[in-house]
Curated annotation (Swiss-Prot):
Record flagged with keyword Phosphoprotein: no
Signal peptide as annotated in the record: none
The organism of origin for this protein: Homo sapiens
Matches recorded under Gene3D superfamilies: Classic Zinc Finger (3.30.160.60)
Official protein name in the record: Zinc finger protein 672
Gene: ZNF672
SMART domains found in the cross-reference section: ZnF_C2H2 (SM00355)
Length: 452
């Protein structure tokens, strides 16, 4: 039961008597010992399902009772499983650990980042004088000025960095800094001889500056994905990618926009969103001139002009211009609905539909009509509503020519035609059947009539 002194010193005092493996907690040891002796399973009295642990059985029984026992003490959000609550609380703890700047209120994830911010933004920086032209600059601007205004070989400053790059004007105070910088030129020029400490992949020949980067790259060849999601079992190459993926299950969005308050699950998504406030759209379409904040969005947009649909569904052959559209479409074949509302339990095929559904619970309707101030939770519903003000009726019925402002009303109208045709067919069939009943005996009385 109890481990050796070495295991105790390592913080694992509970040892398995069968294999000698040590654990930090007795509860973990008990679960491990069940793997040696019998199944030791726990059975649900309502449906007969068996669980490996008592905690799993309790979580399973809550699905019958519809309970949501685990409530976040910070924001009041409720969860069915304690594991999801732990992930959610980790986001609160991460935000609490951030270091705020007392001068401007900006927050940073750790103390070194805060100190660097204060040194760059709030502490008065002593100006540095260029020894060649006597102009004064900040430290970072001085290095840039010397590289541009005084090229290699023109400086006589004894305090200048002694290690200069042979490919560009940059200089470094240590040889290690120069060697690290030289990897940039190696990656940019494949014909240039590689530096001695470059790491090459034996499968595809690609080179990397660090062995750790090469190790991660080799996993792409082997297909190894060591970090598994406990909710859906999906594997990932890096733990950071797994953490971002788990936010799709918990609904956690720790990155908030300071301009409009909108929250995002990833910092990169927040940066792209902030460009919409700044009006920054550097990637323009050469065909129609529409601008985009990210190049990948431009590539997807250009497929509208070219008609390219490179992503095909293996089930039905339908093609799509965007991979994410294919992923959502394939769920219609599998019936998979991985995104679940934590308030009512309703499930959805994509996270965007879940976010729209959540607005119904919160009563949040951010899209307002400029004509009548009516608000909607989805922009598409606002677009349909505005057609009533503009008088647009682009959807025309092929049978009677009646026009409608949107296709949904046209579909409802066409069902009326279908019902009318069905009722007419039933009436005709009934009339024909009645006529046959009355004509049958009269025809049988005619001479020479026989029934086969």
């Amino acid at each position: 039961m109890f481990a050796t002194s070495g295991a105790v010193a390592a913080g694992k005092p509970y040892s398995c008597s069968e294999c000698g493996k040590s654990f930090c907690y007795s509860s973990v040891l008990l679960r491990h010992e069940r793997a040696h002796g019998g199944d030791g399973r726990f059975r649900c009295l309502e449906c007969g399902e068996r669980c490996a642990r008592a905690a799993d059985l309790r979580a399973h029984r809550r699905t019958h009772a519809g309970q949501t026992l685990y409530i976040c003490s910070e924001c009041g959000q409720s969860f069915r499983h304690s594991g999801r609550l732990d992930l959610h609380l980790g986001a609160h703890r991460q935000r609490c650990r951030t270091c705020p700047c007392r001068t401007c209120g900006r927050r940073f994830p750790h103390l070194p980042a805060l100190l660097l911010h204060r040194r760059r933004q709030h502490l008065p920086e002593r100006p540095r004088r260029c020894p060649l032209c006597a102009r004064t600059f900040r430290q970072s601007a001085l290095l840039f000025h010397q590289a541009r205004a005084h090229p290699l070989g023109t400086t006589s400053d004894p305090a200048a960095p002694p290690h200069r790059c042979a490919q560009c004007p940059r200089a470094f105070r240590s040889g290690a800094g120069l060697r690290s910088h030289a990897r940039i030129h190696v990656s940019r020029s494949p014909t240039r001889p590689r530096v001695s400490d470059a790491h090459q992949c034996g499968v595809c020949g690609k080179c990397f500056g660090k062995s750790s980067t090469l190790t991660r790259h080799l996993q792409t060849h082997s297909g190894e994905k060591p970090f598994k999601c406990p909710e859906c079992g999906k594997g990932f190459l890096e733990s950071a990618t797994l953490v971002r993926h788990q936010r799709t299950h918990t609904g956690e969005k720790p990155y908030a926009c300071g301009d409009c308050g909108r929250c995002f699950s990833e910092s990169s998504t927040l940066l792209r969103h902030r460009r919409s406030h700044q009006g920054e759209r550097p990637h323009a379409c050469a065909t129609c001139g529409k601008g985009f904040g990210q190049r990948s969005d431009l590539v997807v947009h250009q497929r509208i002009h070219t008609g390219e649909k490179p992503f095909a569904c293996p089930e039905c052959g339908r093609r799509f211009s965007d991979r994410s559209d294919l992923t959502k479409h394939r769920r219609t074949h599998t019936g998979e609905k991985p995104y679940r509302c934590e308030l009512c339990g309703k499930r959805f095929t994509c996270v965007s539909n879940l976010n729209v559904h959540r607005r119904n619970h919160a009563g949040h309707k951010p899209h307002k009509c400029p004509e009548c101030s009516k608000a909607f939770s989805v922009a598409s519903k606002l677009a349909l509503h505005r057609k009533t003000h503009l008088g647009e009726r682009p959807a025309e019925c092929a049978e009677c020519g009646k026009c409608f402002s949107h296709s949904r009303s046209l579909s409802q109208h066409q069902r009326a035609h279908t019902r009318a045709r069905t009722a007419a067919a039933v009436a005709i069939q009934s009339a024909v059947g009645t006529a046959l009943v009355f004509e049958g005996p009269a025809e049988q009385e005619k001479p020479g009539f026989s029934v086969s």
